[in-house]
């Protein structure tokens, strides 16, 4: 996702603020990263127990509040890709 100039660190802090709730909602892996080459770009990599767990997490009050707080700091440019995880280090079996 792309942030408006100067808001990357605020968005990263918001994204990292709900880790415990994500785990309880069925998130196995949640990684937030930034790019030195593109200072307004934030990457989020998530692995969920299922699509249903992810969809349910978006309905949680704390998730809705974080999204509402972040939206004014974002440009609206999002990309995403859904994968079927075959395995790897750090991925639950």
Predicted features along the sequence, with ranges:
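A short beta-turn/loop motif at secondary-structure boundaries
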Residues: 33-38
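Short glycine-/small-residue motifs
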Residues: 41
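Residue-level signal for secondary-structure boundary sites
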Residues: 7-9, 52, 88
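Short, low-order "capping/linker" segments at domain edges
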Residues: 83-93
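Short, surface-exposed ligand-recognition loops at beta-strand->loop->(often short) alpha-helix junctions
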Residues: 2-12
